[in-house]
């Protein structure tokens, strides 16, 4: 590409600038670049830019900045997105005579700190900072580090949303209030934007020059405490691909000697980036900011309550404040307090504010003053038509002033509003669960027994364990309940798990089911928690941990657990005892709101001889538990809340199960307006045909398909008009489907 100036030499220098809002590229050779740099007003260069306005010189300031970092006196500071690279009018600021703790007068040119930083102390002085509550220990620790002679650079580390930035705002507020040591009196906390600092430094050496100028400015102003949020960004910021001169390396000497006081904030994971640079890390003093407790969060919310009430023009009840803290901690697992509780408070206020039909009183007052001024101006100019218009506007605004919302009319946000927002965020029916919780726990055993037949002992044990946990007597952080269901196939182990999910969590979809026959190999543990670093699939989430992370209120069913590899069972030792598991990405997943149920057929083989309608079952539990020791280790079995044996089903149990299955058939037939009536003899016949001591109740479902559903299908296809059907026994002992009316006629004739 040829030079745009001489059109002879190849262009080796490419400059970018914004002209009238459009980006323009200038391609120059070395000779033309030197000429233009020396004389930006060169006529050839002005012709190349296609600008006719002689007074407008878009590139003069650019090259002036390259030469001495000082624009012409009549040129405003260039923003960082333009070709000046963000240096603007900062050159003269550091050399002005001023007091060490005073803000420069408005007539002075802005320095880099004012251009790329925000004065947090000034914001605190205006009262625009939310109250900082419950962080006194962290603020005192930061002040102690800042009071040191060298290496006085605290770095706040903690999970996202725990209040790291709030600690710095609290420090700024203490400086404004004068509640700091003498060394920190009059200091100014400046929050530096590293991204803007790097922006516009396209030419090699510009960023280093800007950093040196920033350092010089900070050295001259001894009242500066520099705050860098996301401080890990300084590692690698501004470095070229083949160089090692980044912001972190430039700051190292000043940080070690105490010439620069720096406060940083970053997360635990991102602080590892700084830890990789040992020389930089030793100059930092980490301050851990822990997640507040629920009680501390409630105190924080009450402290900022007034700010949000004034902003949204609503009122928060004490119940809503407590619900925001407790329910967010209980149902929102992938974020941290107090951030998630504050978000609930803010969103609830926003939701209620949208229902208000009024304008902010401050806006009305401002518009009224503007209308009165415009009316006066129109009257002076004898524009009476315009004056009449503004007179009507003034009357309108005064009428709106009378409709100001009063304290009595201010909408109140209750616990229900918070619950509704959580339902939208998590798809958990929080309101329904809370309303039903009391009565649900009382009648839990009865509700389960109505769906799970013949396992009253198992149901009673489960209900007691869950009630004990919900009342608050359970061990903290452990799952709501952990059970091992043992018994022969087809006796209701999986069915009880499904009904338990419906009763406790409102839907069978809340059950997370795993067939443990898929986890028979040693490496299959990675499928549950995610592959470790260096293995294929590392970026993919684990099947178990990811589902529980997004749906913490779930029932986890591990079917046929004895078939899984022993390492899988070892992994669940921590889950059953501590209620937590770390996935392949290093995230800790909580199981404290889940119910864990494992089913097994282990130990039932030697007791099958006792299965039957009239068999005695004394001593059977002991034999099953004794056999479990051959399949599971003692430390594994010791961690369950209960090992529950499911007994073989009796004939009466099977009759009740048949009735439930037939009720399900009727429910499916109702979509076609068909109703089926089944006699007691038919039910007994179905039990005789479908019972197998080794198979439990599962063969009954196939029997009903063969003798009821298939027969109904054939009869309905031949008689589509018949909607009222009845299953009866024939004289030969077969099951037959007939019209209910015809069956009644025949039975009445036999009676006669």
Curated annotation (Swiss-Prot):
Molecular functions (GO terms): ATP binding; ATP hydrolysis activity; zinc ion binding
Function as written in the Swiss-Prot or TrEMBL entry: Could be necessary for degrading proteins generated by certain types of stress.
Record-given protein name: ATP-dependent Clp protease ATP-binding subunit ClpE
Compartments where located: Cell membrane
UniProt keyword annotation of ATP-binding present: yes
Positions bound to ATP: 158-165, 487-494
UniProt source species: Streptococcus pneumoniae serotype 4 (strain ATCC BAA-334 / TIGR4)
Membrane as UniProt keyword: yes
PANTHER family associated with the record: ATP-DEPENDENT CLP PROTEASE (PTHR11638), ATP-DEPENDENT CLP PROTEASE, ATP-BINDING SUBUNIT CLPC (PTHR11638:SF175)
Membrane topology, as annotated: Peripheral membrane protein
Region called II, residue ranges: 413-604
Composition-biased stretches (Gly residues): 83-94
């Amino acid at each position: 590409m040829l030079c745009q100036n001489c059109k002879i030499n190849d262009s080796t220098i490419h400059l970018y600038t914004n002209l009238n809002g459009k980006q323009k590229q200038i391609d120059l050779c070395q000779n033309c670049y030197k000429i233009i740099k020396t004389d930006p007003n060169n006529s050839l260069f002005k012709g190349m830019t296609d600008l006719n306005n002689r007074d407008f010189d878009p590139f003069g300031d650019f090259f002036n900045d390259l030469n001495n970092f000082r624009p012409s006196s009549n040129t405003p500071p260039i923003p960082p997105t333009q070709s000046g690279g963000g240096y603007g009018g900062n050159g003269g600021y550091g050399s002005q005579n001023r007091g060490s703790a005073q803000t420069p007068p408005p007539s002075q040119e802005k320095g880099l700190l004012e251009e790329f930083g925000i004065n947090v102390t000034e914001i605190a002085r205006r009262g625009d900072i939310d109250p900082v509550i419950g962080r006194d220990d962290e603020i005192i620790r930061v002040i102690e580090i800042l009071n040191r002679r060298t290496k006085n650079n605290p770095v706040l580390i903690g999970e996202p949303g725990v209040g790291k930035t709030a600690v710095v705002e609290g420090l700024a507020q203490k400086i404004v209030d004068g509640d700091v040591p003498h060394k920190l009196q009059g200091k100014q906390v400046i929050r530096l934007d590293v991204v803007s600092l790097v922006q516009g430094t396209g030419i090699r050496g510009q960023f280093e020059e800007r950093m040196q100028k920033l350092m010089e400015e900070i050295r001259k102003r001894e009242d500066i405490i520099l705050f860098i949020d996301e401080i890990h960004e300084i590692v690698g910021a501004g470095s070229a691909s083949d160089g090692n001169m980044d912001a972190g390396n430039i700051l190292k000497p000043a940080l070690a000697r105490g010439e620069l006081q720096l406060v940083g904030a970053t997360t635990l994971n991102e602080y590892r980036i700084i830890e990789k640079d040992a020389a930089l890390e030793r100059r930092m003093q980490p301050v851990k900011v822990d997640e507040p407790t629920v009680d501390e969060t409630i105190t924080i919310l009450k402290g900022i309550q007034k700010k949000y009430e004034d902003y949204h023009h609503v009122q928060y009840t004490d119940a809503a404040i407590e619900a925001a803290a407790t329910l967010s901690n209980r149902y929102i697992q992938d974020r941290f307090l107090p951030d998630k509780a504050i978000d609930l408070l803010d969103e609830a206020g926003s939701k209620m504010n949208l229902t208000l039909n009024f304008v902010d009183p401050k806006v009305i007052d401002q518009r009224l003053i503007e209308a009165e001024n415009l009316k006066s101006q129109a009257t002076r100019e004898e524009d009476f038509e315009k004056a009449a218009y503004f007179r009507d506007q003034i009357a309108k605004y005064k009428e709106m002033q009378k409709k100001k919302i009063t304290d009595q009319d201010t909408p109140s946000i209750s616990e229900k509003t918070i619950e509704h927002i959580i339902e939208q965020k998590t798809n958990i029916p929080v309101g329904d669960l809370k309303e039903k919780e009391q009565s649900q726990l009382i009648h839990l055993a009865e509700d389960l027994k109505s769906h799970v037949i013949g396992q009253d002992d198992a149901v009673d044990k489960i209900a007691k364990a869950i009630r004990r946990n919900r009342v608050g007597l359970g061990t903290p952080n452990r799952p709501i309940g952990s059970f091992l269901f043992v018994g022969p196939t087809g006796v209701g182990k999986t069915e009880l798990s499904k009904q338990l999910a419906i009763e406790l969590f409102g839907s069978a979809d809340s059950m997370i089911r795993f067939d443990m026959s898929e986890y028979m190999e040693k490496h299959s543990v990675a499928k549950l928690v995610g592959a470790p670093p260096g293995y294929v699939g590392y970026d993919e989430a684990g099947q178990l941990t990811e589902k529980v992370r997004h749906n913490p209120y779930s029932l986890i069913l591990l079917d046929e657990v004895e078939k899984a590899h022993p390492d899988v069972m070892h992994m669940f030792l921590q889950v059953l005892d501590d209620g937590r598991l770390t996935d392949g990405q290093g995230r800790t997943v909580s199981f404290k709101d889940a119910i864990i149920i494992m089913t097994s057929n282990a130990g039932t083989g030697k007791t099958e001889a006792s299965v039957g309608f009239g068999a005695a079952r004394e001593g059977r539990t002991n034999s099953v538990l004794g056999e479990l020791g051959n399949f599971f280790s003692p430390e594994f079995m010791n961690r369950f809340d209960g090992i529950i044996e499911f007994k073989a089903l009796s004939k009466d149990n099977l009759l009740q199960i048949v009735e439930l299955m037939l009720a399900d058939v009727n429910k499916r037939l109702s979509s076609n307006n068909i109703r089926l009536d089944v006699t007691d003899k038919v039910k007994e016949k179905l039990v005789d045909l479908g019972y197998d001591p080794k198979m439990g109740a599962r063969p009954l479902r196939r029997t009903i398909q063969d003798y009821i559903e298939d027969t109904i299908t054939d009869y309905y296809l031949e008689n589509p008009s018949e909607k009222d059907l009845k299953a009866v026994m024939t004289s030969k002992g077969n099951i037959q489907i007939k019209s209910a009316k015809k069956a009644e006629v025949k039975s009445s004739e036999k009676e006669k």
